Amino acid sequence: MLGYIFKRLLYMIPTLFGMSLISFLIIQLPPGDYLTSMIATMSDSGQTVDPAQIERLKEIYGFDDPFYIQYLKWIWGIVSRGDFGYSFEWGQPVSGLIWARMGSTLVISLLSLLFVWIVALPIGIYSAVRRHSVGDHVFTFFGFIGLAVPNFILALTLMYVAYKYLGQSVGGLNSPQYAGAPWSFAKVGDFLAHLWIPIIIIGASGTAALIRILRANLTDELHKPYVITARAKGLPEYKVILKYPVRIALNPFVSAIGWVLPHLVSGVTITAIVLNLPTAGPLLFRALVSQDMYLAGSFILLLSALTLVGMLLSDLLLALLDPRIRFN
């Protein structure tokens, strides 16, 4: 097992370099660059653009360098100094911008993940064991609603309900009176009171999807010969269901780690913009729109690394959970 892990880690190194090169290339495919966007914005607002200043900025930012020179400078800074470059739009180091958003991003995403698993697991088991019952039809209906309704529509609906009927301020993770205030018990309580909306919204589609997957997998397992034999031998029903069928049907929950880890960082971008959440998703979106190449490239590289780590973790956990995978 250790040899397998070491080999997978070695494979990750060239994969990350390839992903960084492709992402850096894709970011530069649209015509123009950050300075082009800035000049267009200044011209639209009636400001004069000094050509000499533009040339000086191109020299400072290295826009006149060939593509491969820009890429090598960026990737060498990451490897040698942990320097992800400089954000043109924000005027700050990229690493500081990214890590400043990580706290709220991880809190919201991890709680959303727990919400998904806590809700989806019992409902999925119930729907598989009590197929075509009234409860199964109700959960199926709401599951399809959760899959069909866009997250930002659900966000607008819950914002209206929270403001209209609960008297809660909408948008952000704190009430206006706590904006910029130091952390205190009152601010923590207000923060927790605002968390339920993004947790439900971000977790809705994932919960609905995992319920359907778990229901289908567990239904298939419950009709296999070993389950029929266990029932014939008189094992209690809860043991028949929970000991092996549920354990095998949980594989999708574990394999989901491969896409959950990057999702923890990027989040649901449109929903975060609607809710005005201080997470990483809106920052990545803004960097892509403004062609802030080092900020956008660093985000994509981070998401790629988390995807590879998530796939490795899911493979290892699946091997521990399911002996069939371990032996193969």
Task: Kindly give the residue locations of the regions a language model identified.
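Transmembrane alpha-helix boundary and packing residues in multipass membrane permease domains
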Residues: 20, 24, 82, 125, ...
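Membrane-water interface segments at the C-terminal ends of transmembrane alpha-helices
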Residues: 22-29, 62, 76, 142-173, ...
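Hydrophobic alpha-helical transmembrane segments of membrane transport/permease proteins
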Residues: 16-69, 165-187
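Short hydrophobic, aromatic-rich alpha-helical segments embedded in or entering the lipid bilayer
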Residues: 48-80, 275-287
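An internal, D/E-rich "acidic patch" concept
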Residues: 62-121
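N-terminal signal-anchor/signal peptide hydrophobic helix marking the start
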Residues: 6-12
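Alpha-helical transmembrane segments of integral membrane proteins
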Residues: 2-3, 102-135, 151, 178-328
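Residue-level recognition of pore/gate-forming positions within transmembrane alpha-helices
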Residues: 12, 20, 144, 160-161, ...
